[in-house]
Amino acid sequence: MAVSCTPTLGLSSAPDEIQHPHIKFSEWKFKLFRVRSFEKTTEENQKEKNSSEGKPSLEQSPAVLDKASGQKPEVAPPAFKVHPKFSKKFHDDGKARDKAIHQANLRHLCRICGNSLKTDEHNRRYPVHGPVDSKTQGLLRKKEKKATSWPDLIAKVFRIDVKTDVDSIHPTEFCHNCWRIMHRKFSGAPCEVYFPRNATMEWHPHAPSCDICYTARRGLKRRNHQPNVQLSKKLKTVLDQARQARQRKRRVQARITSKEVMKMIANCSKIHLSTKLLAVDFPAHFVKSISCQICEHILADPVETSCKHVFCRICILRCLKVMGSYCPSCQYPCFPTDLESPVKSFLCILNSLIVKCSAPECNEEVSLEKYNHHVSSHKESRDTFVHINKGGRPRQHLLSLTRRAQKHRLRELKLQVKAFADKEEGGDVKSVCLTLFLLALRARNEHRQADELEAIMQGRGSGLQPAVCLAIRVNTFLSCSQYHKMYRTVKAITGRQIFQPLHALRNAEKVLLPGYHPFEWQPPLKNVSSSTDVGIIDGLSGLSSSVDDYPVDTIAKRFRYDSALVSALMDMEEDILEGMRSQDLEDYLNGPFTVVVKESCDGMGDVTEKHGSGPAVPEKAVRFSFTVMKITIAHGSQNVKVFEEAKPNSELCCKPLCLMLADESDHETLTAILSPLIAEREAMKSSELMLEMGGILRTFKFIFRGTGYDEKLVREVEGLEASGSVYICTLCDATRLEASQNLVFHSITRSHAENLERYEVWRSNPYHESVEELRDRVKGVSAKPFIETVPSIDALHCDIGNAAEFYKIFQLEIGEVYKNPSASKEERKRWQATLDKHLRKKMNLKPIMRMNGNFARKLMTIETVEAVCELIPSKERHEALRELMELYLKMKPVWRSSCPAKECPESLCQYSFNSQRFAELLSTKFKYRYEGKITNYFHKTLAHVPEIIERDGSIGAWASEGNESGNKLFRRFRKMNARQSKCYEMEDVLKHHWLYTSKYLQKFMNAHNAVKNSGFTMNSQVSLEDPLGIEDSLESQYSMEF
């Protein structure tokens, strides 16, 4: 390149005589290599070009001109621009250097709070993506928290997700102050820690105005003088290029060396398949995605790191052990505990790849999933001819032989294994053989089958236990056919037997259903079979039929009462033994235990189903059930309580005993079905049950309390007249007139024995009295009582009956009946329509045909009274209605609570006063309604509640609410178990309902839900029966607010 020279002033101000010629040459040299400005205009370039025409070129001119010529050589700066390629390279190198500095600064900052890690004098820092330290691990184990790494704890305590962090943006360590905050969260110990920020620390990529780098640069250091860029830029560029080339070469060599080292560490060329065996020529990117990034073979048993790189399990574990806990691809922190299985879609694609068989004589192409099996067939075929064969046809493979031939061929090996097992393993041949099989699978890299076999050896199994599957089926309301469809679908999709087949569930059912456990009665029960393996029986069994008997058109299924009680006790075995331990009683105590049983019975209305064959039965149902309320043991001179039902009104503890499609008003049918059951119950009262529980024969006595009946059914089974009778009460002999005149002061006088005596008087009429006189003598007993009930109040139906009466009072107050008692029927209907419309608008209460528990609960509130008062013009009536409702709401908890002495002691103490004031209001302000009459449940509420509480301790615990909830389950089970025969359908319903109430299955279901919801999830929901999980334990501590 020719560069023109123009005579200009020298660089030095000294005279020419004293300047050395080499100095001038050096100045000329620097001017020669100086790079001109990139912004120089075209006019300046043109001027320089014109001025250089006709001048000698650089090659033609000497280094120093003759002094005689009188000219001082001076080289004009060259007019050329830097190539864009070099400009971009300089820019990229600068950016890379800035990023490296930024990343170095990040290493000294805390990931959570952003403070500098240098401020800690002990230099305590913790890896964000590492396993928790031993102290924290011990604390988590003590608190029963399942955690092994910091990311989960950081996400829980600080609400920061660090699993997606990038090293170039986020710091990789956190400070001791944040560690102490997490430690305090889990330990609950007060300590002086604080969080220095008011918001979450946000991290951004490096930018020209980066706060992190600017903070690191500023300070009191003296700034270095910048070299003269104009003079040294070209020389510096050449040196930088040479250095970068050397670094690039070094990096490539290091990468190649690192790859070779990792391949040497993995050493898997003999067990993993090369990508050259792929049958299809896939794109390079796809091949890279399905190959291990360490050994570059096709992925075998792939695992995924937290940074989303995929490796063979053996390769990554070996590399982590030798090279440290970093990802081989991106150097991101990685630990063996972070390895997870890739997503199923990726595994499906990987397993479906077609590969060529590596055997030289085989040209088959098989899927990767079946490759091991295919190759093993080659080995087996080769091994077929290895054995000594003294002529004849070739030896057949072992698996193709009959069982007898297999025994003959393996006889010598079997003897050797037996000798080894006897010598080393105590004769456990099975464990030795399973372990050999397990090692063979591991050696052939078939880890999935090996894991399943190992789980079976440990008793866990690869899937769920049959009891867990049964609990899932029962609690999700799946019939057998629906469960079987789900089982087949899951097995076909996953290839694993996660759920157990139906026959395994039926084996688990047998243990839980009545008729499995042996027992004995001392003395034996009268008129009851001594056999114990009795399951579901027909409701009419044991009924002696004759031509004159009442023809029973019904379908009934039941358990035998004693067998059902034994099954219920064995289902509660763990609870009973745990209760004994909690009372510091020895496990070997054999009793006698006293079991208190609540009995419930209720009729159901329309249960019509449009299917099933069988007799024409009424589409109404009756259910008889029982609940084990309390179990005590005689210890010394006192009875110690070892079990008490925590939720006595739950449908989960109300066990069905008898189901029948019959009308509860049909006295003959009801008597025919329930009489054998009542006979068993009467026989059990005078005998003791001998049952083996916990390996010890124990003695049980039973106390039966029939309290879960509504008033209609009590009158039916106790032989009393219907609820419209003049004898208003099932607890005392008061008539309706007597009860209205004396609202409060009555005592309980009726009993089952007295009713039986009165029935005999009614039947025989020994005094030869008239009907009216006889009726007055027996106080309303008109039929033979056949079920013994406890004189009590059913809390649920008491609420419903009282709410219906208040609903009527609201209508009468709207119509101002206290002024005009003689209102027509049309006017009364208009008042009801007005009330319904207003309640729907104000209280969102939709009108119903018949009062139910939910409507009663919503209706009986102060808000409802306020809404009704808007329709009543008189202020005085407002006050009377409000006071009546307030008194009722003060009295209601006494008969609704399970233990009023603990739950509402004040209301219990004030009950007598409140009931007298309530009665006074009825007889004065509401005299138009209650003069000479009163409703059945108002009478029981005002007169008998304190006496029942004093006798039983509670009314609410003995209510029929659990049985009412069971009625809803009956409808659901019946729809679910629809079969062609109604007879079998009732068996399915009874069996499914019994399993639904099993405490054993409920524990399995709770444990299954706890495992499913465990882990550090942001919105985990723990079942109510579970102990406090980590979510609750964290939230109950101090709330972490930034």
Swiss-Prot record:
Signal peptide: none annotated. Belongs to the RAG1 family. Residues 40-52 have a biased composition (Basic and acidic residues). SMART domains: RING (SM00184). Binds 1 divalent metal cation per subunit. Mg(2+) or Mn(2+). InterPro entries: RAG1, RAG1_imp-bd, RAG1_Znf, RAG_nonamer-bd_dom, Znf_C2H2_sf, Znf_C3HC4_RING-type, Znf_RING, Znf_RING/FYVE/PHD. Zn(2+) 2 binds at residues 292, 295, 312, 315. Zn(2+) 3 binds at residues 307, 309, 327, 330. A zinc finger (RAG1-type) spans 353-382. It comes from Oryctolagus cuniculus (Rabbit). This is V(D)J recombination-activating protein 1.
